[in-house]
Structure formats: C-alpha cells, structure tokens
Amino acid sequence: MQDTVTTSALLDPSHSSVSTQDNSSTGGHTSSTSPQLSKPSITPVPAKSRNPHPRANIRRMRRIIAEDPEWSLAIVPLLTELCIQHIIRNFQKNPILKQMLPEHQQKVLNHLSPDLPLAVTANLIDSENYWLRCCMHRWPVCHVAHHGGSWKRMFFERHLENLLKHFIPGTTDPAVILDLLPLCRNYVRRVHVDQFLPPVQLPAQLRPGDQSDSGSEGEMEEPTVDHYQLGDLVAGLSHLEELDLVYDVKDCGMNFEWNLFLFTYRDCLSLAAAIKACHTLKIFKLTRSKVDDDKARIIIRSLLDHPVLEELDLSQNLIGDRGARGAAKLLSHSRLRVLNLANNQVRAPGAQSLAHALAHNTNLISLNLRLNCIEDEGGQALAHALQTNKCLTTLHLGGNELSEPTATLLSQVLAINTTLTSINLSCNHIGLDGGKQLLEGMSDNKTLLEFDLRLSDVAQESEYLIGQALYANREAARQRALNPSHFMSTITANGPENSVG
C-alpha cells in the first residue's frame, strides 16, 4: 500500500496529500465503512501522455478550418501537376507544348522563364502573355502600339534593333544577326535603328622606312569607316514594311570624331541595293545622316517604279536642288503618298521641279518642305501647281522666306481647291496685306481645317477671322462624319450648284 501511495504522488501531486491524510487517520489500515475515501488512494491517476490521442486535438481532425484561409490539408499533388512541373523544368531540352491540352499549355506558359533561348521559343510559342513577360523583363518602357499591338512582334523588332545598334564591323561576328533572321523573319515588320557604329580604329604601327629623314610621318592610308551592310538583313526579312535609319553615334564622349557620323559612299550603294530588292517596303526613312545630293539621287534611283512604296522621309540632311529634282522624278514613277524633305537645302529651282511633278500627280497627299529656302519663286510655283492638283491634303512650307506674292497666289488656291485640309506657313514674312489676301481666300473655302500662320507677321484681326472660318469648316466636317447619309441627301436635294454655302 505504501508503494501505491508513492507512485500516485509521483504521477499526480494533487492526490498525494489526500492519500497521506487517509493513511494517517486509519493508522495504515483501510476502513471498511468509508470505501469512497479510500478509493483515490488505491486507484492511480493515469499519466499525461506526451503524444495524446488524435481525438484529443479537435483542430487537427478538422478537414476545413474556416477561420484560417491559408490552412490546407497536406495532400499528395496530382499527377498532372507533377508532369507540368517536370515539363517546365526541362522545357529547354524537351519543348513539348502543342501536344498538351489548352488548360495545361496555359499553366506551362505562365511559369516558363523569359530567358529561354529564342531557338526554342520563337516558332513554338504564340502566346501574347508570354511575350509580354519577355518584353517587360528586358525593357522597363514598352510602347506596344508602335509595333502593331503585338508583344511578340515588339520583342523581336527591339531585339534585332539592339543587335544592329551595337554591331561593330570587323569585331562583332555577323552570325549574331544572321542566325536570328530565320527566327524573326515572320514577325519583324519595322526596323528602326538610330545608331550605326563604325569599325574600331587601332593605332597604326610604323614600319622601318615609314618616316622621312626629317622625321615627319610618311603617307598613311585613311582607315575605312563603313558601317554594317544591310543587304543580308533586308533580304532575310520577308515581311519588312518600314525601314527607319539614322547613321549616327550616341554617347561617344571623349572619343568624338567627325568621321564617326559619316554616311559613306559604300554605305549608300549597299543601302540602295537593299531597298531596291525589298518589294514589301512601304515606308523608308533616312534622316540625320548627312545625305547630300549625290547620295540622295542614288537612293532615289533605286526606288523608281517601286511597287508598294508609300512614304519617303529624307528630312534633316544636306539635300539641295539636284536631290529635289530626283525626288520630283520619283513622284512620276512611283505610288508615293508622303514626301518629307524638311530641313534640307532646297531652293527655288528644286521647288519648281517638285511643283511641275505635283501638277500632274494623283497619289501624293502630303508634302513637307519645312526649313528650306524656296522663297517666293518656289512658293508661287507650288501655288500654281495646287490650282490643278486634286489629291494633296497637307502642305508644310514653314520657314521658307515666303512673303506677300506667295500669299496672293495661295489665296486663289484656297478659293478653288477642295482637297487641302492643312497648310502651314509659319515663320515666314506673309505681312499684313498677305494676311488679308489669305482671309479673302478663306471666305470661299469649306474644306481647310488647319492653317498655321504663327510668326508670319499677319494682323491679329486677320488671324482671328481666319480662325473663325476654320472653326466653321471643322464643325461642318464633324457633322458630315456624324451623319453622312443626311449630308448626301441634302446635296442631292439642293443640286450640285447649291451644295456649297
């Protein structure tokens, strides 16, 4: 009995005092008249288990714990999930995607790394969400609208442009670009390169006999500065529609030299051959590249009778009257709709050549001669051409030393022309009388929507009244756009003689 009490006390101290008190009162013997008092001293208290029975933990037995949204019962992953994870980890070695169900394909694409080799992903993955992640991973600013709204097209166009901008002739392996062409040829439609690096010029080592007796240097051969030749690139892009080039060097710092910015004769010949062979090219831009008359004529000659060319931009170069005559010939031998020769060296003879071609042209809708020096002689020639031209809608003659004689002829154009919607004569010397002449012409015009006369010495009153006439024309155009059927019925009812005014 003593052993029983001792064991009970070790197991549960709360019962030790009761057992000792009972033993002392009975003198070590159990009383038969009080069995209820002696029962705790006989029956040991069960010990607390360190690993209680699962039923003791109600929370553990619950399969759903509503108050803990992050809790979940540990289960074995589905076999499909294990397979998807394995495919993602080994996609570069075994790129299976087309054989999977659509919902499984989406799971794989959502977890693929954007750093996978293009040889694996280019012609296999068409998901725009995947290419969106690739673009955002490489470039913090992405304007997908400039690339037709396609993230895949944007990725390949910008990736190719980045390679071209950092290509160093004689140093960079051409295979870097040529190997990419089969992967991107179906997606690249626009190439915009604003930098072409020249070859690295190493210091020439003088050989014995290269110096004269006086110690002066002998005659040294001028190093070549030709840039990357675009022939193979353009030929490899079967859907190329726009080519925008600037032969310039950025961030040259202390390594500045004038020959870094040369558009060489060989560059010109190579580029001319490339664009002549590209029968899908619709827009060609070559700006800020010091293109003179000779190089411009080479470029323009390669574009004669081009089947689909619609826009030519040679702005901000060194093109003079000879280059303008070449552009005038192009107007007669192409389907060109936009011609931009802004900020060049075109004078009156060049403008007269363009005017002669414009008088018989039926395709051109926009002509930009801003920041040249055609003066009144060239301006009047263009005004005469516009009296017969029925297709031009936009004319920019800002900053061309124009004055009142040109304004007088343009007022006659405004009275009879029904296609022009935008004219810019800013930064000229139109004068007070010229402004009045233009106002008189605007009184009979119902189609012009924009007329820029800033910094042209026009009286404030004339400028205000011209603005009122433009507002009326824009309001009428808006009404026609909102209800074209009503406008046509009105013309039919009133007859053609009453349709204006």
Swiss-Prot record:
Q: Which InterPro entries match?
A: DRC5, Leu-rich_rpt, LRR_dom_sf
Alphabetized Pfam families for the sequence: LRR_6
Q: Which UniProt keywords apply?
A: Cell projection, Cilium, Cytoplasm, Cytoskeleton, Flagellum, Leucine-rich repeat, Repeat
Task: Spell out the Polar residues composition-biased ranges.
Answer: 1-23
Bias (Low complexity): 24-34
Localization in the cell:
Cell projection, Cilium, Flagellum; Cytoplasm, Cytoskeleton, Flagellum axoneme
Which CDD domains does this chain map to? Answer: LRR_RI
Q: Spell out the protein name for this chain.
A: Dynein regulatory complex subunit 5
Q: Which organism is it from?
A: Homo sapiens (Human)
Q: Which gene encodes it?
A: TCTE1
